[in-house]
């Protein structure tokens, strides 16, 4: 069973585990575990997706319980009326907050976007980040005798594919566990020495107005066991107590894309 963090007669939100696909995809015919089907079976009714999380990303996933509500929520996302807050562990010291305003060309999938045009102009892309904690560990990865990491809060202003992963890599603080845009040596080092191989990107909060009642909602998804384990080893326990504690009884294959 998935952790349901909010449910009423119109919407449902769950804490999506890292490694889970949101829905069935012909790109991965061998996968058998999906968020939509699991939630549908769990609550006994059809659900409608209104946004997505990449497979290796965990956290708040909001779904509608009717097509009408799905349209209303989709419009809120399109008009940037819903605010998202993520947390990430990145390479290096991030000592203060800032904004990444860096236009990005569309990132095409070799299979899914085989026939898509590859000459589109870069799209405006803006992300905000906040420094929360830093650590230096006596671990020689690469040319240095120690390794430095930071915990950051991220708030995307736009919603491009892999935006946060690409923006943090652009400012030389790639997200740990990102095999596409990250530092592969750091990824291996963290996996080998700290036992954490997942992408360290988590959708912690969604702030929105309820599509039917207008009530202001803040949906919060807490960290899973691997994430919390790394927080403990880095001495970061207690920095965000409202996000600590949750275990997923079901397992799914990890895929860092």
Curated annotation (Swiss-Prot):
InterPro entries documented for this protein: PsdUridine_synth_cat_dom_sf, PsdUridine_synth_RluA-like_CS, PsdUridine_synth_RsuA/RluA, RluA_PseudoU_synthase
Pfam families according to UniProt: PseudoU_synth_2
Key word Ion transport present: no
SUPFAM superfamilies: Pseudouridine synthase (SSF55120)
Stored Gene3D superfamilies: Pseudouridine synthase
An example Gene Ontology molecular-function term: tRNA pseudouridine(65) synthase activity
Domain of life: Bacteria
The enzyme's E.C. designation: 5.4.99.26
Record field: catalytic activity: uridine(65) in tRNA = pseudouridine(65) in tRNA
Residues at the active site: 54
GO biological process: enzyme-directed rRNA pseudouridine synthesis; tRNA processing
Keywords recorded for this protein, A-Z: Isomerase, tRNA processing
General function of this protein: Responsible for synthesis of pseudouridine from uracil-65 in transfer RNAs.
Stated family: Belongs to the pseudouridine synthase RluA family.
NCBIfam families associated with the record: PRK11112.1
Protein name: tRNA pseudouridine synthase C
Organism expressing this protein natively: Yersinia pestis
């Amino acid at each position: 069973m998935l952790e349901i963090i909010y449910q009423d007669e119109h919407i449902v939100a769950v804490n999506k585990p890292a490694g889970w696909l949101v829905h069935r995809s012909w790109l991965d015919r061998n996968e058998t575990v999906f968020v939509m089907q699991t939630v549908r079976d769990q609550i006994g009714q059809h659900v409608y997706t209104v946004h997505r999380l990449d497979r290796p990303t965990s956290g708040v996933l909001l779904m509608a319980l009717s097509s009408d509500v799905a349209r209303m929520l989709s419009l809120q996302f399109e008009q940037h009326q819903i605010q998202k807050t993520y947390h990430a562990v990145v390479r290096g010291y991030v000592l203060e907050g800032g904004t990444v305003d860096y236009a990005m060309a569309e990132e095409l999938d070799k299979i899914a976007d085989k026939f898509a045009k590859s000459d589109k102009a870069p799209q405006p892309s803006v992300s905000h980040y906040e420094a929360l904690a830093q650590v230096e560990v006596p671990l020689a990865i690469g040319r240095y005798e120690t390794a430095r990491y930071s915990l950051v809060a991220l708030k995307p202003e736009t919603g491009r594919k892999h935006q946060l992963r690409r923006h943090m890599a652009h400012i030389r603080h790639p997200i740990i566990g990102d095999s596409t845009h990250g530092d592969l040596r750091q990824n291996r080092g963290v996996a080998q020495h700290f036992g954490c191989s997942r992408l360290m990107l988590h959708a912690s909060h969604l702030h929105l107005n309820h599509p039917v009642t207008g009530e202001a909602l803040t949906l919060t998804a807490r960290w899973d066991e691997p994430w919390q384990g790394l927080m403990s080893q880095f001495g970061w326990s207690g920095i965000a107590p409202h996000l600590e504690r949750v275990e997923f009884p079901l397992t799914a294959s990890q895929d860092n894309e």
